[in-house]
Amino acid sequence: MRSGGWVLILAAAVTLVGTVWNLAPLFDPNRVRPRGDGREARSYDFDLTTTLVPKEKIVSCGMVADALPPLDDPKVITLAELSGLETVGRGKYLVPKDKVIGVVINGVSRAYPLRVLVWHEVVNDTVSGVPIVVTYNPLSEGIAVFDRRVAGQALTFGVSGLLYQSNLLMYDHAGSHAAESLWSQLQARAIAGPAASEARTLDVVPFALARWEDWQAAWPETTILGPVNGDGTKYGQDVYGTYFNSDDLRFPVDPLPPAGSLGRKTRVFVSGTPGAWTVTPLGVQNDESRFEVVGPSGTTPVPGFYAFWFAWYATHADDPGTTETTESR
């Protein structure tokens, strides 16, 4: 399928889910005009006067800003509530093999199912008094968790509708378009707007990527990101399966990893600091029998990033540490 068709299918799916959930009633005269036209980056009204990445490489994902609605102060449920939810629902909200992003802050554990994040990408949450943002970008398979506190202020983030190297660009809700900045998920920094001019960065929060059954066993007191409404079965749709099973890319990426490097969509975990990254391949794409967890035994959070190799390479091509890889586990 050509790129345009894939984008239209994803956009249609998002629109359908949004309609069902009544997130933005179509005929509400007070509804704010959607931000962006789904084609030109400049139509999204972000300040691109000065950018820390090549401006021409910032592109639209084909949808308006926040078409994938971020979750702010989301509903959180306990294991007991999860059991009740599954009893009354038409299906299970979580099954043992589902992948979750797990965090533990001051002894408080929480799980964020990927099947939920695929429809939101950004979750602004607070765990044990610490404001965090949990991010997942399926196009790059990018996963990162950050402390939302920047320069003494707890920011909230949205989904800009723009990409850099086929990776999520978030934006902060700063009150006005002129005050907002774009933030790169895999670079953990502002790349456009006032925060970029001030060289603002995000602090990484340790996370684990694990199967739900393993996370629950390790953290029996864990809470879980709950469904937006109802029983959560709307999250069962999968629009990325074909994409995950091929080497095709849907948006511009330059540079690509050199020949003889890891496969484009080899999943990697990256730890360290700029100039001294450790890049660990995690196995064959979409091969559930070789699913690798992040963190010791998959249940102890560690600081770092998870992504497809092509996305990490492209967003860190100028960093000498990018080429240092270890053997696949």
Where are the regions a protein language model picked out?
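Mid-to-C-terminal functional-domain signal that highlights helix-capping/loop sites
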Residues: 2-329
